[in-house]
């Protein structure tokens, strides 16, 4: 369970203080970022009341983005203004915004996503239905989002969440990741999604997830962009 903490709070001060900060990041994550220094980066969840001082503290710890969750079974939907109210503060810091949604909801949130002034990183390839063809209308809309908006990126992650064929190959997910990597080689990221929260079908072997990479990024150049160049540009140039 995620709890809110000030970046430098100790337990007694926090428990005695009735005000909670307007961001969500586990204390352990903040500590890890501070210990790692410039070697690690983080993404936080923030609320509209967040102050510039709180964001500055997070920036100093290594946070470089915020996350909006639109998956209905995990979060209550909110009006666009709720999210837009946060974007100017985030843009001032040079951060990006991560968005998590399911493919059928993309059309509904299209206007919001295309109005965001920062780099926008989509989790898990927009959660496509991998039983549908990669050239089908659902994934075509997601590809259009990236084609028409040069600030939109995609994580080619989460095959364990999307696959119907299952581990260890996750073969039905590979064509979707490959299409993104080869079409937008400078705007894709990879991640394990460890520790795999809310997984019900199986607990994936992270080594098997790594093995999917060369099947999506089939050349050394594409792999280097996916794993090195792109994350350096997004997380360390901000």
Question: Where are the model-predicted features located?
Answer:
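An amphipathic alpha-helical core segment
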Residues: 197-199
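Mid-to-C-terminal alpha-helical segments outside catalytic/metal-binding sites
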Residues: 1-11, 179, 185-189, 201-238
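Structural recognition of the beta-strand scaffold that forms the well-ordered cores
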Residues: 13-14, 67, 121, 155
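Catalytic pocket-lining loop regions of alpha/beta-barrel enzymes
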Residues: 79-190
């Amino acid at each position: 369970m995620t709890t809110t903490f000030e970046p430098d709070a100790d337990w007694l001060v926090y428990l005695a203080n009735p005000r909670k900060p307007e961001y969500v990041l586990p204390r352990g994550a903040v500590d890890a970022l501070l210990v790692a220094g410039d070697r690690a980066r983080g993404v936080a969840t923030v609320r509209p009341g967040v102050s510039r001082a709180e964001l500055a503290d997070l920036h100093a710890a290594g946070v470089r983005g915020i996350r909006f969750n639109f998956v209905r079974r995990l979060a209550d939907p909110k009006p666009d203004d709720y999210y837009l109210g946060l974007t100017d503060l985030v843009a001032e810091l040079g951060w990006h915004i991560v968005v998590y949604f399911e493919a059928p909801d993309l059309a509904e949130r299209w206007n919001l996503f295309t109005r965001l002034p920062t780099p926008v990183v989509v989790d898990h390839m927009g959660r496509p239905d991998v039983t549908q063809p990669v050239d089908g209308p659902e994934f075509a809309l997601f590809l259009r989002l990236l084609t028409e908006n040069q600030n939109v990126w995609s994580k080619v992650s989460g095959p364990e969440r999307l696959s119907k064929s299952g581990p260890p190959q996750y073969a039905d997910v590979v064509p979707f990741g490959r299409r993104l990597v080869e079409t937008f080689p400078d705007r894709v990221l990879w991640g394990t999604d460890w520790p795999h929260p809310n997984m019900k079908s199986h607990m994936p072997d992270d080594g098997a997830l790594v093995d999917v990479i060369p099947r999506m990024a089939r050349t050394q150049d594409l792999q280097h962009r996916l794993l090195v160049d792109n994350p350096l540009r997004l997380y360390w140039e901000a």
